[in-house]
Regions:
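Active-site helix of classical SDR
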Residues: 122, 158
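Active-site loop immediately N-terminal to the catalytic Tyr-X3-Lys motif
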Residues: 100, 147-153
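Conserved glycine-rich Rossmann-like NAD(P)H-binding loop of the short-chain dehydrogenase/reductase
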Residues: 28-45
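Conserved glycine-rich cofactor-binding loop
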Residues: 7, 14-16
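Substrate-binding pocket helix/loop in short-chain dehydrogenase/reductase
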Residues: 98-99, 106-111
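The beta1-alpha1 cofactor-binding region of Rossmann-like NAD(H)/NADP(H)-dependent oxidoreductases
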Residues: 40-41, 61-73, 104
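Residue(s) in the substrate-gating loop at a strand-loop-helix junction
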Residues: 142
Length: 158
């Protein structure tokens, strides 16, 4: 297995693309930390699927949009695992609305999760990756960042 002994943190891993990334990393031998902010049941389902296939995983709740909570999550994971080899910044949300109808909270929620969340995770893991002399950071994005969609000004900007 290509990733045997590696520790991988996947944000937004309870469903969609993040779920599939988590399953694929586990299949390649990585210990997978399934980060989620919404449904604990869906995150535990991903963990269960990984462990039933012989892998190792755990679910960790944290809104990556929150700077302090993201820092706390990273410190806790490093204390327990001693390293993080792979960070996949996948967490993302949408709050679609035409710009003229969009309120500031809808705009901010998307930017805080999709853009600031990526910053928060990289900020709080980068020193550890330098200390361990290695690591991989993978940032997932959307084609919507290149080709905008009506009603998604916030999402496209993020």
């Amino acid at each position: 297995m290509l990733l045997e002994g590696k520790i991988a943190l996947v944000t937004g891993a309870s469903r969609g693309i993040g779920r599939q990334i988590a399953l694929t990393l586990a299949k390649e031998g990585a210990v997978v930390i399934v980060n989620y902010n919404g449904s604990a049941a869906k995150a535990e389902e991903v963990v269960r699927e990984i462990t039933e296939a012989g892998g190792t995983a755990e679910a960790v709740q944290c809104s990556v949009s929150d700077y302090a909570k993201t820092e706390e999550m990273m410190k806790d994971l490093i204390a327990r695992y001693k390293r993080i080899d792979i960070l996949v910044n996948n967490a993302g949300i949408t709050k679609d609305n035409l710009l003229m109808k969009m309120n500031e909270e809808e705009y901010d929620a998307v930017l805080d999760t999709n853009l600031k969340g990526t910053f928060n995770c990289i900020k709080h893991i980068s020193r550890q990756m330098l200390k361990q002399k290695g690591g991989r950071i993978i940032n997932i994005s959307s084609v919507s960042g290149v080709m905008g969609n009506a009603g998604q000004a916030n999402y496209c900007a993020s």
